[in-house]
UniProtKB/Swiss-Prot annotation:
Chemical reaction(s) catalysed: L-isoleucine + 2-oxoglutarate = (S)-3-methyl-2-oxopentanoate + L-glutamate; L-leucine + 2-oxoglutarate = 4-methyl-2-oxopentanoate + L-glutamate; L-valine + 2-oxoglutarate = 3-methyl-2-oxobutanoate + L-glutamate
Organism: Glarea lozoyensis (strain ATCC 20868 / MF5171)
Disulphide-bonded residues: none
Pfam families per record: Aminotran_4
Cofactor: pyridoxal 5'-phosphate
GO BP terms, alphabetized: amino acid biosynthetic process; branched-chain amino acid biosynthetic process
Biological or metabolic pathway of the protein: Mycotoxin biosynthesis
UniProt keywords, alphabetically: Amino-acid biosynthesis, Aminotransferase, Branched-chain amino acid biosynthesis, Pyridoxal phosphate, Transferase
Keyword Transferase tagged: yes
UniProt enzyme class: transferase
E.C. code: 2.6.1.42
InterPro entries according to UniProt: Aminotrans_IV, Aminotransferase-like, B_amino_transII, BCAT-like_C, BCAT-like_N
Name of the protein: Branched-chain amino acid aminotransferase gloG
């Protein structure tokens, strides 16, 4: 910590019961791209959370929009740190190229994120609460047009809000999962592997209906054969095989899923434990072989799965493992990941970036 930076957490906020609803913060960051200049402007901090956008902007009409998800944590010393932000910058650029948005250079992306977080450090929850500051970079085509033409103006913004873990009790007790069978999330050679809103809007109703039926998560199979596991609606899929001398972490190599930074981090930690890691097609028939299953993502971090139901076949797999046991693979992996994110152990992999005063 330096003098007056970062600011301590605000008083009067119930940091232990934040939920995931927006809370008014100090402001956000904006940058603009114009084909006239062919470059992004420098980050500007804006206090008004609302954006003046033309109703005919392609970002509103044609889905020419991308986003990211990141988190900032307060470490034991009171400093604020980001987890692998360079990887978010690279994924943001890949998403931009898919929908004809000028990629935001990595250095500009990181400066914009640093400014957005640095101007809101009083909203970073206290260390040890389990809460964090969620960071939402997003970009969209903003110039008005009704034709399918390349846009001439674009907006890049970074919003932040303090949050609790996404799935609440399921994070500790285990999530119940429903396989979605009447909707394909993504097609081969489509947009499933980038973070565009069009991948998420169509599943909102499915997620809501599943929750009404008592399910915490929804799982998608591949659209070609409906026999392979792709990912959960909002997070990556991780399975654990315990039929050898050491555990084997199994993740999908599908080209229809988002390249998950959390999944990649879990795989790296597993290798550090001298466990095996397999990245390959995952048959749905394998869910009964797994000793443990997790949903992994920025918002959820790592959520243990208690059961998976596929109604069309009557398959209902229940995992009897005690996830809270310190000997479970879940406990070892989730503890190792959280300890790094929250600054409890040395950063041997250079995954952590401290937020500096803007």
């Amino acid at each position: 910590m330096t003098e007056n930076f970062p600011l301590p957490p605000l008083l009067g906020v119930d940091w232990d019961h934040l939920g995931f609803e927006p809370l008014e913060v100090n402001g956000h960051v904006e940058c603009t791209f114009s084909t006239t200049t062919s470059c992004w402007t420098e980050p500007v901090f804006v206090t008004n959370p609302y954006l003046p956008v033309h109703g005919l902007a392609p970002g509103l009409n044609y889905g020419q929009q991308i986003f990211e998800g990141m988190k900032a944590f307060r470490n034991p010393s009171g400093d604020v740190q980001l987890f692998r932000p360079d990887q978010n910058a690279l994924r943001f650029a890949r998403s931009a190229l898919r929908v004809a948005i000028p990629p935001v250079p990595t250095d500009l992306f990181l400066r914009a994120v640093n400014t957005a977080v640095g101007m809101n450090t009083d909203f970073v929850p206290p260390h040890g609460t389990g809460a964090s500051l969620y960071i939402r970079p997003m970009a969209f085509a903003s110039s008005p047009t009704v034709g399918l033409f390349l846009a001439s103006q674009f907006k890049f913004c970074v919003y932040v809000l303090p949050v609790s873990p996404l799935h609440g009790k399921a994070t500790q007790e285990g999530a119940s999962v429903l396989v979605i069978e009447d909707f394909d999330r993504a097609a081969p050679l489509g947009t499933g592997n980038v973070k565009v809103g069009g991948n998420y809007g169509p599943v909102l109703g499915l997620i809501d209906e599943a929750k009404k039926q008592g399910f915490n998560l929804t799982l998608h199979l591949d659209s070609l054969s409906h026999s392979l596991i792709d990912e959960f609606s909002t997070s990556g899929f991780i399975g654990v095989l315990n039929d050898g001398e050491v555990p084997t972490i199994v993740v999908s190599d599908s080209q229809q899923v988002v390249s998950s930074i959390t999944v990649d981090s879990i795989c790296e930690l597993a290798r550090a434990f001298d466990w095996h890691v397999q990245k390959r097609p995952i048959s749905f028939l394998e869910v009964a072989r797994f000793s443990e299953v997790y949903a992994a993502g920025t918002a959820a971090v790592l959520v243990p799965v208690e059961s998976i139901l596929r109604r069309s076949t009557g398959e209902h797999v229940v995992y009897s493992v005690e996830y809270s046991s310190p000997t479970s693979c879940f406990s070892r992996l989730s503890t190792a990941l959280r300890d790094i994110q929250q600054g409890l152990v040395p950063d041997d992999r250079s995954w952590i970036k401290l937020v500096t005063k803007p």
